[in-house]
Amino acid sequence: MQYANCRSCFFAAVKCNPDPYVLRLLAGLGTGFDCASNNEIARVLELGNVDPSRIIFANPCKAVSFIRNAAKSGVNMMTFDNVDELYKVARTHPSAKLVLRILTDDSKSLCRLGLKFGAPLVAVPGLLAKAQELGLSVIGVSFHVGSGSYDSSAFADAIARARAAFDMGKAAGYTFTLLDVGGGFEDATFEANAAVLSEAIDHHFPDRGSIRLIAEPGRFYVSKAFHLAANIIARRAPIAGDACISNEEANAPSVMCTCLIFFLPFFASASHVAPLADFSSH
């Protein structure tokens, strides 16, 4: 977990693997936690040794009940990217420490989270003005370049956008003290990404002073430590003579699945699978 080029505090993404053993291990190492739901917050606090200040509620579109529960649990740091969220927070958790999630270029990632989260820079002044009007505290900026990012330049571009958002914050009367660089880290490219981030931060935030840097790695922590086993509950053979399927494709092993838009699976057979003809037709 120690990298020379990493200058951020880690907040592990609980959604990636909420196994109690993993959470206890990370908590013991002093890691913070990125939670996206009531259940994830409860799992972390149930460990007994994690102060609520070590949690960021990194979900920009929360149910009112979620915000109310965060307030009761002492979780103050949370993200937003829209006006509706500001109204909800003002009603149910006015003492929250808000982090503005901005939209970045995530086109060079396997999972483009910008399809659902992040405020474009053009919307930032209006959001900050509304936050001021409602008397809310905005402490910083967050972004996410997408899960499975495969181009380090995405981080440099995101830092440049964050700098612009910081300047907009100053113009709106805020002094931001937090920069959350999100996740999207891969083990094979972590050092390269950290180097790009470090250089970009030095360039765009030479006056960073007391700005706190945090990151939200998820699969980076656990992808090599776990495998997910699942049963094959049905099989279907290719239709003979299907013009859309070549002979080579028909003979190649394949898997039919769904609900994988936000997952990056690698399939491997764990045991011998009987030929399709061995299955009863009943």
Stretch-by-stretch model annotation:
Residues M1-N5:
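An N-cap/entry alpha-helix motif that binds or orients negatively charged groups
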Residues S8-C9, I55, V141, L260-P265, ...:
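Short non-domain terminal segments
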Residues D151-H282:
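C-terminal active-site-proximal or functional interface alpha/beta core segments in diverse enzymes
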Residues C9-L178, F190-E191, A200, H204-F205, ...:
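Active-site-proximal beta-alpha core segment in soluble small-molecule metabolic enzymes
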